[in-house]
């Protein structure tokens, strides 16, 4: 006997829609966070075709930067034939913006693509899920804390920013972390969609009582920083947020006044 019936709405999911580009070299990028405030930011950009062919390939890396309000605030490009290119992001690249998001795009010469057998440039899709590293400014350490890209699906077409990301039904997103005492948290939310995104942040105590501690509207392609100080707290709590993003992850910086950690939720 069938135990699960399709008549129940919670057994259904949104229908998958295949996206086929009609132009050459589609680049689908995650939405990455940059910080030029009291942190240094580096980005490890992949040269997809060099990795695919196991040989150095000349690649143009193009980076587009967006402010907290979602406006285009900077563009930087560089040519490299290395398998990976490390970019150190500074405020000159970001138009003076200290916090925001960015995407990564690549371009290859059509002459090179024609030499690779079996490749149709109109069916060639590059996915950029590179790694972003963070380190406190003027740190004596040469090490960065890295994490991969956040939910994106963004690309540039004829100079215009577009996205295949869509907002879905409102739901609660509960990460696998706890809010500890004696910490300072910075939660960064990025909106990879072309619509205004509403976020409500909720804390849940050990008695399972919840309270809303923050609400924000994030502009299309914008970002939002939420701060939470637990130095005066006496108990551990859980955190959730209400969102319309299918994958509503935040980027979290956890500080104790001396050390910090950065991770996805």
Question: What are these regions, as identified by a protein language model?
Answer:
Residues 1-265:
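Gly/Pro-rich, tryptophan- and cysteine-flecked surface segments typical
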């Amino acid at each position: 006997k069938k135990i699960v019936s399709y008549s129940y709405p919670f057994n259904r999911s949104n229908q998958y829609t295949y996206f086929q580009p009609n132009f050459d070299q589609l680049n689908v990028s995650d939405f990455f966070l940059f910080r030029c405030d009291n942190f240094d930011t580096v980005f490890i950009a992949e040269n997809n075709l060099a990795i695919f062919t196991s040989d150095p390939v000349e690649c143009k890396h193009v980076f587009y930067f967006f402010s907290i309000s979602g406006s285009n605030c900077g563009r930087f490009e560089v040519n490299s034939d290395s398998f990976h290119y490390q970019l150190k992001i500074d405020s000159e690249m970001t138009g003076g913006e200290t916090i925001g998001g960015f995407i990564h795009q690549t371009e290859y010469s059509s002459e090179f693509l024609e030499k690779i057998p079996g490749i149709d440039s109109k069916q060639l899709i590059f996915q950029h899920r590179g790694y972003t590293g963070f380190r406190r400014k003027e740190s004596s350490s040469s090490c960065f804390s890295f994490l991969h890209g956040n939910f994106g699906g963004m690309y540039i077409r004829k100079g215009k920013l577009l996205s295949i990301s869509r907002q879905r039904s409102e739901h609660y997103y509960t990460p696998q972390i706890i809010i500890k005492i004696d910490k300072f948290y910075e939660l960064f939310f990025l909106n990879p969609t072309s619509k205004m995104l509403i976020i409500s942040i909720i804390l849940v105590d050990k008695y399972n009582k919840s309270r809303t501690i923050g609400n924000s509207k994030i502009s299309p392609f914008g970002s939002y920083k939420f701060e939470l100080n637990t130095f005066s707290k006496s108990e551990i709590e859980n955190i959730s947020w209400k969102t319309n993003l299918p994958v509503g992850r935040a980027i979290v910086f956890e500080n104790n006044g001396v050390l910090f950690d950065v991770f996805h939720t």
